[in-house]
Each structure stands twice: as C-alpha cells, then as structure tokens.
Amino acid sequence: MLRSTGFFRAIDCPYWSGAPGGPCRRPYCHFRHRGARGSGAPGDGGEAPPAAGLGYDPYNPELPKPPAQRENGTLGLGEEPRPDVLELELVNQAIEAVRSEVELEQRRYRELLETTREHRSAEAPALAPRGPNASPTVGPDEDAFPLAFDYSPGSHGLLSPDAGYQPTPLAAPAEPGSKYSLASLDRGQGRGGGGGGALEYVPKAVSQPRRHSRPVPSGKYVVDNSRPPTDLEYDPLSNYSARHLSRASSRDERAAKRPRGSRGSEPYTPAPKKLCDPFGSCDARFSDSEDEAATVPGNEPTTASTPKARADPEIKATGQPPSKEGLEAEGGGLRETKETAVQCDVGDLQPPPAKPASPAQVQSSQDGGCPKEGKPKKKKTGAPPAPSCKDGAQGKDKTKDKGRGRPVEKPRADKKGPQASSPRRKAERPEGTKKKPSSATPVATSGKGRPDRPARRPSPTSGDSRPAAGRGPPRPLQLPDRKSTKAPSGKLVERKARSLDEGASQDAPKLKKRALSHADLFGDESEDEAAGPGVPSVWPSALPSLSSDSDSDSDSSLGFPEAQGPPKRLKASPPPSPAPSSSSSSSSSTSSAGADVDYSALEKEVDFDSDPMEECLRIFNESTSVKTEDRGRLARQPPKEEKSEEKGLSGLTTLFPGQKRRISHLSKQGQEVEPPRRGPAVPPARPPTAQEVCYLRAQQAQRASASLLQAPARLAEKSPSVHISAPGEKRRIAHIPNPRLAAAPTGAKRTLAASGSQSSNGPEPGGQQLKTRTLSGMASKTTTTIIPKRIAHSPSLQSLKKPIIPKEFGGKVPTVIRQRYLNLFIEECLKFCTSNQEAIEKALNEEKVAYDRSPSKNIYLNVAVNTLKKLRGLAPSAVPGLSKTSGRRVVSHEVVLGGRLAAKTSFSLSRPSSPRVEDLKGAALYSRLREYLLTQDQLKENGYPFPHPERPGGAIIFTAEEKRPKDSSCRTCCRCGTEYLVSSSGRCIRDEECYYHWGRLRRNRVAGGWETQYMCCSAAAGSVGCQVAKQHVQDGRKERLEGFVKTFEKELSGDTHPGIYALDCEMSYTTYGLELTRVTVVDTDVHVVYDTFVKPDNEIVDYNTRFSGVTEADLADTSVTLRDVQAVLLSMFSADTILIGHSLESDLLALKVIHSTVVDTSVLFPHRLGLPYKRSLRNLMADYLRQIIQDNVDGHSSSEDAGACMHLVIWKVREDAKTKR
C-alpha cells in the first residue's frame, strides 16, 4: 500500500504500448499508459497517457500530474461528487430525464477531448452564449451525473448522467460568476455538443465559485451549481472534487449540499454514464488536446494568462453560455462550454471581468490568488508548485508541461506537501479548500474567474485558496490538507484514488466512475470534511474551475491545492463520467486553448441560467436534511441501480468503488480548505483503517471478478497476454474461490457496471480495459494470496471443538490433567464413533467415571490410563489379531506390514510355522499345553496318586504321612482338630458339636512382628471357632486308597488330538470322610461336556454346602455312583488327554482316578512362599483375569471353577506366547 514515488510516470509502460487499451492491467503500474485514455478519448494522446497511467495506478496518489489535464474537468468532479453523491440519490428521480442529455454531453465531451483545444476554444465561445439556459438544465444535470457516475463509491458515482444535475453548478452559483459559469457551461455544453465538457467543467467551476459563490448574490445557483458541478466533476476526479466541494458546500451551504444529495439520487442515472463513456474517449482526447491546446495560441494565452481572460473571451465570443440543447448537440462545444463554465466560475468569483487573457491579467488575478498559493506553497514546500499566478501568466503551454510534467511532481508534492504541511492544510482546508480551487482556477483561467474565487475564498479561506492557486503542487498539498484533516493515511488513500481516477479517466470515464472516492465509500468522512468548513458548495464550483484551469493552464490544478489532489481524479474522472469529464476536460482544453473567453461567458451564462439550476437548487435544498455522510451513502445506493443496468462492467467497477474511496479523499482535498469540519468528519469517515479499506477493496474486487467471470471477462481471461482485462479476469477467477466475497455485493457490481456502460460510448473501451486492469490487479493483490490461505486454513475450520473442563477450586485432580486425558479420550473415540458429537459425549462420560472413581491424582492417572487402553482396544485395527497378541511371538509378513513396528521389525517367512496366538485351539493349543504338563516330580510333590506297584486298584501318595493311630476307633476332626471316637460303621460314638473356622489362617505384618488370623472372622489363631457343626468330620481320602482306576491309551485318528478338558469336583463329608458328590468337565471353549451329581457310597454327615454348593435336595433323586462316573471319564479321557484343574490331586483322589497328564493352575501360578502354600482359584482369577468367582454364599459351582481353570491356562499360554517369540 506504499505510495509510488512516480519516478517512472514519464516512461511509457512496456506492457501498455501494445494495444490501444494496453494489456497492462496492473493497478500498481508505475509507468505511463498512453493508450489507456486513448481508448476512451483519442485526443488524450499526450496527456491522457500519463493521466491514464497515473489514473491507472490506484495506489499512486502522486500521479495527479496527468490529472492536470483532467484536473480541469475532473478535479472539480472529484470534489463535487462527494456532496453530489448524497444529492444525486435524492435527485435521482428528477434527473432521470436529464440522464439522456448527460449521456449525450458525455459523448460530446469525449469527442471534444479528441478535438484539439483550439477546437474547444472555437466551440467554447459559441457555447458560452447559448449555454446560459441549456447549461443549467443539461449541464448541471449532465455534470452532476458524470460526477455521480465518477463518484461511484455510492449511487453518486454511478449517477454520472444524473451528475448533470450536479450540485456543483449550485456551488458555482453560490458565487455570481461561478454560478453563471456553471449554468452557462452546462447549457453551452448541451448546445454546443460539449455537454459532457460543460457538465464536467461546470462541476469544477461551480465547485470553486461555490466557495466564493456564497458571497455571490445568486445563492440559489450557487447551491444548484455546486451540486451539479460536484456530480459532473466527480467523474473520477470530479467526484473527488465533488466530495471536497460538496463538503465545502455542505459546510458553507448545507442546503446546497442537500440538493446535491437529492440530485445524487436523480443525477445518479447510469444512462449519462454511458454517454460519459463515449465522451470519456473525447475526454482522453481532451487531455491530449488540452496539452496541445495549451500550446495553441489564443486559447492558451488566455487560459494560461488568466482564468478571467479565458472566461471573458468565452463570454464575449459566445455572448451567452451554450444552452442545454447546444450542450447536447456538440460534444466538443460542451467540453469548451465546461471549460468556459469553469472560467466563468472563476470570473464569478472575481466578477466575470473582461476576458483579458493577457498574462498581466492572469498575473494580476493570480496575484490575488498568489497569497493563497503562497500558503499552500508553504504547506507544499516539497511539492512542485502548480502554475499559480506565475503559471497562469505563462499560459496553456505551462499547463501542458505542468499537466504532464508536474502531474508527476504533483503527486509527489501532494505526498510531501500534504504530509509535511498537513497540519497547516488542515487548518487551511476549510478556507484553502475553497480558496485553493479558486486560486487554482485563476491560474488556470488566466485569473479571471479564479482570482475572483480566490478573492471570495479568501473570506472563507482566502489564504489557503490563493496558495493552492499559486502552486501546481499545492493541489497535491490540498490532498495533504485533506489528509491532515482526516489522517495521513486518508491523504495517501485520496492520492491513490486520485491517481487511479486520473488514469481511469484517461482510460475511460467509466473507470473513474468505477473508482469510488473515499467520500463515496465512506461518504461520511469525505462529505463531512468537505462540508465542514462550508466549502462543499464553494468547492464543487471551485473544483470545476480548477479542473478546467488545470487542463488549460495546469495552474488550476496547481492553483487549487484541492484541485491538484483531485486533478489526479480529475483526469481519471473525466472518462468515468464522460459528461462531467468532458465538460471539465473540454473546459480545461478550451481554457488552455484560449477558451478563457468562452469560460467566462459560460460562467456568466451558467449563473444566469436559472431554470435547471433553480431546480437543482430546489432539489439540493430538499436534500439539505440529509447528512453529508448520508449523502455519500445515498449516492452509493443509486449507483446500485446503475450497477444492475451494467452488470457486465460491474466487476470492473467494483474495484473502482475502492478508487472512489480515493476520490472521496480527493473530496477531502477539497475539504482541506475546511479542516474544522473535516477534522470531525474525518474521524467518522476515517474509522476504517487502511487494513479495513484494503479488505473492503478486496471484497469488492472479488465481487467484481465474480461478475466478470460470468461475463465476456472469461474470454479476456483466456487471452491474458492479448487483453489487459484477460489477466485481471483470470485473477478474478482466482478470486472466485471466495464465493461470498465475489457474490455478496451485487449492488456494487451493478453500480460499477452501470458506470462503465454509461461511459462505454467514448472512453468505455479504454476505460473498461483500464477498469478491468485495475479491478483485476486489485483483486489479484487482495485475493490471490487470500484464496490459497483460506484453502489452506479451511481444514482447520473443520477441526473439532473439544469441550473444556471448567476449573474448580480444591479439585481432586488438576484441571490440566483432566483436560489432557479428555482430549485423548476424544481422539480415541473419534476412531470408532459415527459422529463427532457421539465421540465427545462418550469421552466426557469416560472421563467423568474416571474422575468420580479417583480420590487422588495418582489414582486418577491409573484409571485414566486404563480407560485409554480400553478405548484403544475398541477402535478397529487393520490387523484384528495383532492388537490382542501384539504379535510378539509370531512375526509374519502380514503382521509386520500392519503393525506399528513394521519399519523397524525384521521378519522371516519361514518362521510363521507356529500359529498365531489368536488361533490357539485344538491341536495347536494341545501342543502348547504340553509345555505346562506337570512332571513326575511335581506330581509327587503335590500329592497326586500313582498306581500302587503291588496292589491292583490301589494307589500310593508320596507326600502322605503315615500315621499309625493308637486306636483304630480314634479319629481327628479335620476342621477343629479335636480327636473323637467312632464306631465300626464310622459314626461318632458321642454327639459333640464342632466349633471351627472355615477360613484359612493368614499372616499379617504388624508392629513388632507377624500376626496370624483367620480369614473368616479375623480371629487370632487358636481362638474358638466361629462356626458350629453338629459333629466332627474327617477327610479319610488318603487313608483309603482302594478302588482307583487308571486312564489308558487310545489310538487317535488323523488330525485329532487326545483332548483338553478342565475338571472340578465337589465333595461332602460322610461317615468315612470326604466323598464325591458332583463332577463337571468342560472343554477348551468352556462348554460343559459332563456334569452330574454323585451319590456317595456312605451316609452323608455334612454336605459342606459352603464350599461344595451341594444340598440334600440335589442328591435326593441322584442314583449315579462313583463307578458310573469313573466309567464315563475313562471313556472320555485317554492317557494323553490333558486335564486342567486347580489342586487337581484332590479331585482325582475323590474320583479315584490315576492320571498323570495334567496341568495344575496351583502349580502354574505358584504361591510366592512355595509349597505347601497355594493360591486360591478365586485370587488367581481376580489378579490375572480381573474376574470374581466363588462369590456366592450358596457355595462354589464346579462348572464355574472348571471354566475358570480353563481361562487361566489359555491366558497363560497366550501371554507366554507373546514373550517367547
């Protein structure tokens, strides 16, 4: 966004010379574009190219030098559009009738641009006499419309045709000379065929006269003139001027400002813009002709000598400003009429004195303006002074030189001077805004009309006005003034907008109209600033004069600090609003070519022509209630209608709305003269920062590009090298990715398009190309980088919003830890949940459960980790079995490819001989379990029965203690340890209750040693039992080792295996000890294959239900005996069948079966103290499988115990398989 220094403005763009429109579409191009305006107006050749280049560069406010040519026609427009935007909206309806006339004037204006200044000067005198009546109606309306069109920031810019109604003429009427100049100019333009020129010129002339017009008796015209000239002058630059003028006028005459708002609505009609486009080309010619005309003797001396001289010759030669019809009839005449109107406005400022164009008069009038210029010069010490009194005396040649050479300097001066002297300019703006235009006008118009304005402005801001007139650079200073009033950034923006407007005006009136001034975009700022000092009414008229003078003598641009700032837009503005730009350009051409006389006459005629002006004044007065800020916005709205009419150009125009913002800055320049009100207005309008402005511009560019993509712009995009718009359009395609931005503001697109279409006749070709270039360039700058960023960031937009755990004081677990695990839970849940919301809810529930279960941080961490593992297990894995077994033992190609260690783990294709852990069943499991079979020694150590070597059916236990009872009838109770006597049948001889502890003894560490307690009641060892039985009981299994059977070997078929079974038995106490009462066998799938109650051979003394779970009812109907069970088991098992159980020796003793192929879980999971200690099955299941068994008060279940043993053994095998890979 840095401002260009303008070092390359004098060099033709290498990418521009190829075609008339030039392929260069870069809004930031630092080179001169000769063909840009040429397309709009062939006559712009010399000056137009620089102006085009300058206007083309929306970011180089220093480019106002080319505006010197257009400054005459466009500068005023730039200022006027600000107040006119509001007025145009209000006047839209009333001006629709004038739109056609404005269009014609615009076309004529472009034609006039094509014609030499000599031709303008010739036509100007003719236009001056006939302009008086027609000019007010046609001229003002047309001017207003061009300005509105130019001002396209709001409806104002789009209302270029309505600009004909412009309040700038009203501003001009404010001063007697200015008002008449505007009316005369308008009519002269309409009649003379220079309607566009008259319109354009009138805004400028009216802008300055308006400042001085306040003092002038013709107040109604002053208001009316100010408004129409503002609209007319706005084109691109005229809009700037209109803004400044408008603000100045609104400050000086809010009534006038209001009319401008009304007229903004009515003059807003896009039709005149179309005309403006045709005349935009004329305007381009006009710039060239201006330069050439500046050299032309007669007109040049008059214009250069003194604005008065120009105005007088016009008045004398024409007698009366050309009428409206004449204005419409002759485009060239209209332009001259506009210039004449500008000069007349100057003359009005200083009563339209004799047209003496002699350098003496110029100097004398400039002398009056010199003091004013002196101040601006001081302000703009760094900026090259525009031809002020001296320059005015020099003549049109200087105007050319200054217009071309100084436009470059002017931008610099504007930058430097405005920045350096921004404080002074702020103060001077209220005055300088009016005075500068008037001083600039005298310089440009040989001091005739301009000096008067400076004189009148001196009252409001005579010092400022004169310095502005006295220096060409002061015009840039005026931009700085506006800056100072608003902000340096605002000035820069204004300068950029002005330079863009100038380039745009040279390229095409449309382009400038597209360019929205800051005032249009931020109507509040620019209008308020301009209106604050009361300059609005004066500014519009003064700006028209300025633009005319600057075109003719470049003194106007230099003379008017504001004009200098606006000149950038001024030149840019003529193409945008052909009528205003043509009028301003033609007036400037005419003044430079010696149209001073015509201008004076036109000024008088414009002032005298009261019909259109009165109507405009009335409309403006009606809109007086509308705020200056609102006016800019209202003006924007009417342009939306035009936008709808010109959708094809809407995309191109969209960028220019940003430029119109700059135009609004030009308006600020006009307001620079009125810093007091600007200051307040600037903050309101300024609120948008540079970044915000850039963002808005980017949005507008995107919208424009979107519309262009749908239009022939796509074709242009296909051939970017050939067409300037093609590259821009392609960029717009790139912008399309943001459909919101591209499609959001349709109204703005329509407005821009409408303005472009209105100026399509003349400058539209070049202007549209320039617009397209600027739009595409801006779009590419703003959106090309934005699009990729958005695309890259779009994934982040889809990122899941994770819930945040609120902080709580005194929480058990720090919130940070809880939040971390919650995020982990969400990530895991997202892997298997169908929706994000479901995953979040599940994670929240899991985290809450973990938090509720955790009394401390450490426990929460453990629980959270376990929960996280559980959630990870729920997530589907590419290799289902891998997660279960970790694939450590078996490394297969498939497992490695699917595992996390695939890149680090080596694998062998020959190794997968062993099955995967998940497939451990049948023979595979059998082969693995063979590793866990008890050895002979282990069998002996654990008390397993072995066949007796001597007694068939007998068994032997190697761990049994041989106790020889002293008495065969004496027994020892296995529960309480009490000795009791039994009969031969085994019954107790005495009935004694048995007090016992059913729980085992457990040693606990206590202070000073160990303590042994019973697990059942925690009573100390040796204490009385907690349970009572009817009688004592004995085990007796190891004492009776008869009736044992041994499993035998069987032949196996094919692929079958001997089998794997888990076994568990329940026993009850009988008269002979423990005997089998229930047996259960399960397979590897934990399916019960055999389960039955067994009736003991002896009488049951105690069912031992607490442990066996067998009740009397269970055995009541049982007829199965031990022999039956043995027969079944021998048929099921073979010698190689693997039997699994916990302390299986007790079960085998109960079954009286001898079997050595066993897997004992008590041995597989040994007690840490070793034998004889063994861990209970219940504890093993709780520790390893996290399962609780034997928790039923009714006793154990043999099937449950058998299944538990099978689970434990399979788990053990799999765990070992993981570690033994």
From Swiss-Prot:
Biased composition (Basic and acidic residues): 393-417, 492-501, 627-648
Record has Phosphoprotein as a keyword: yes
CDD domains to which the protein is assigned, alphabetical: REX1_like
Protein keywords: Coiled coil, Exonuclease, Hydrolase, Methylation, Nuclease, Nucleus, Phosphoprotein
Region (Interaction with ELOA): 498-577
Assembly and interaction partners: Interacts with TCEA2 and ELOA.
Function statement: Seems to have no detectable effect on transcription elongation in vitro.
Name of the featured protein: RNA exonuclease 1 homolog
UniProt organism field: Homo sapiens
The encoding gene: REXO1
